[in-house]
Amino acid sequence: MKKYIILAMVALLMSSCAEQITRLAQYPKMYEEKPLSIAVMPPINQTNFVEAKDYFYTTLYAPLCEKGYYVYSPMMTMEMFQAESAYDAEQFIEADLSPFRNVLGADAAMFTIIKSWKRSKIGGSLTAGVEYILRSTKTGETLYHREGLISVDTSVHSGAGGLFGALVDIAATAINTAATDKVVAGRKCTLFVLSDMPEGKYGTKFDKDQTLPAGKSYIKATVK
């Protein structure tokens, strides 16, 4: 019996290893084109929370910079997008992106689709469902695509026992959830989802992360 259990565990381990895919295999066009600069497109908001678009737009800059890319500041490009009627990214998500290459010099454009945005004061969480699509301004090809449903845990545990302790935790959680900045929550979501994105020229692992594991195309997780 013990022999069969060991064999089953080995088979399971081999199966899990076989299913793991590298970043080169998952995102081959990222390594082919090697984009250096990214223009962040205004998010496409599919939720009832109207402000989600503006909040989330400002969260994309830092995480992409940390991945080693030159990113055009959303604050700088916003006026240009509005003047060129590009603030509604829906009309560009499948369109020709060469104008952004010609005007800005951007190698790629990052599109985001906000599919859900929910705050739970009692449970203590901010949950965002976002799809990320990076398209080449040169070829129009999708270079990177990933979607995540990420909950930012804002719960507070005082350590006090009994009914009083539970009430204190509930009250503290509600306050902490309300006080958690939406920009902070959005940035944490982006950092987590883009964690397997191949690094750009200014990253320490540029052109060296091909063999690192890529994540699943859709992820669901809770972060602190």
Each language-model region and where it sits:
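Post-signal peptide N-terminal segment of mature Sec-exported envelope proteins
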Residues: 26-48
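N-terminal segment of the mature soluble domain
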Residues: 47-111, 141, 178
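Extracytoplasmic/secreted cell-surface and envelope-processing proteins
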Residues: 119-123
